Amino acid sequence: MIDLKVLRENPDAVRASQLARGEDPGLVDALADADTARRAAISAADNLRAEQKSASRLVGKASPEERPALLAAAKELADKVRAAESAQAEAEKAYSAAHMAISNVIIDGVPAGGEDDFVVLDTVGEPTALTDPKDHLELGESLGLIDMERGAKVSGSRFYFLTGFGALLQLGLFQLAVRTATENGFTLVIPPVLVRPEIMSGTGFLGAHADEVYRVEADDLYLVGTSEVPLAGYHSGEILDLSEGPKRYAGWSSCFRREAGSYGKDTRGIIRVHQFDKVEGFVYCRPEEAEAEHDRLLGWQRQMLGLIEVPYRVIDIAAGDLGSSAARKFDCEAWVPTQQTYRELTSTSNCTTFQARRLGVRYRDENGKPQTAATLNGTLATTRWLVAILENHQQPDGSVRIPEALVPYVGTEVLTPKN
């Protein structure tokens, strides 16, 4: 949820953010009206309760002659209190709905526009020049790494098996990510992949894209699409000690996405699938530290991409392509030779205080007063990285060279086709 102080002091900034996102600026006025109505309802109920308390004292002191009239007035006042409390509850409900409807306020400098309006911040390496390159699936099948056919037989479309060196390659990639994270002060966490509705909602994943989330209706739980969700919920309702700096976690988990809005897109291979694995960095910090921490997350992502030796670019995502929780997001996209384009391998989002406010995550400031924390997240490795590794490191004979940093984990320098 956005900070109401920002809404009250600078509603134009919130309207501008909504417009940049391509969302309804009228929601800002609706929230302002709901906030005013809620505060009025609270005040009215408080005043009536105070009046009721005074009336009760009068009844206790009243003479027998005065008592009947005072009791009748007290009963009438009790009815008014009940009505006022009911009105307050309705006002609170309307306010909460209006508050939840507004996306996070974007940070100054975020590009306006939609999916294609990103800004390229940096490009690293030259696109790999290959003659008649094979795509990752052809390579994966010839090397015995990926089995889509049996994945579909067992689970349906967009499922797969990673086998042999394919499994070792992913495991090695994740071990490298964990080593990178822990060397930089992250605590490794293997979180649950089923979460309660309030945690999924608190992170902003039950809004416009709720149809992308798998739900286990019998237990009223949701399968996570990223360990960002359980890690955001990890400290929900808590007051953190951030006096020694940010709290950084690296979550290793399986992730699940329905891809409901992706019909017909990336149907070949493992670029867009229903289940994959990921190591996700997650940070709690003071709001004033968030932008610097965002840059650090991006730096660790770039370090990982350097270790797997693929050409990539860094882009600043436009406001209309941001999730509701993100105030700014950077993506790192790797070159995919067979598609002759860059594809997303990482994203890192600065969610400012948006998620923490929903989830009740706070810290104590220098005066000991509880304040809302900021949260950030960023990919450190995921299954999709295998696409970039296989395609960029393929050799003319159909083999694939393993990046030097992964050789100790995979156990070989070259993967060769099976006969």
Swiss-Prot record:
NCBIfam families registered for this protein in UniProt: serS
What is catalysed by this protein? tRNA(Ser) + L-serine + ATP = L-seryl-tRNA(Ser) + AMP + diphosphate + H(+); tRNA(Sec) + L-serine + ATP = L-seryl-tRNA(Sec) + AMP + diphosphate + H(+)
Keywords associated with the record: Aminoacyl-tRNA synthetase, ATP-binding, Cytoplasm, Ligase, Nucleotide-binding, Protein biosynthesis
Name used for this protein in its record: Serine--tRNA ligase
Q: Which gene encodes it?
A: serS
MF terms in GO: ATP binding; serine-tRNA ligase activity
Pathway participation: Aminoacyl-tRNA biosynthesis; selenocysteinyl-tRNA(Sec) biosynthesis; L-seryl-tRNA(Sec) from L-serine and tRNA(Sec): step 1/1
Query: Which N-terminal residues, if any, form the signal peptide?
Result: none
Family affiliation: Belongs to the class-II aminoacyl-tRNA synthetase family. Type-1 seryl-tRNA synthetase subfamily.
Give a short account of what the protein does. Answer: Catalyzes the attachment of serine to tRNA(Ser). Is also able to aminoacylate tRNA(Sec) with serine, to form the misacylated tRNA L-seryl-tRNA(Sec), which will be further converted into selenocysteinyl-tRNA(Sec).
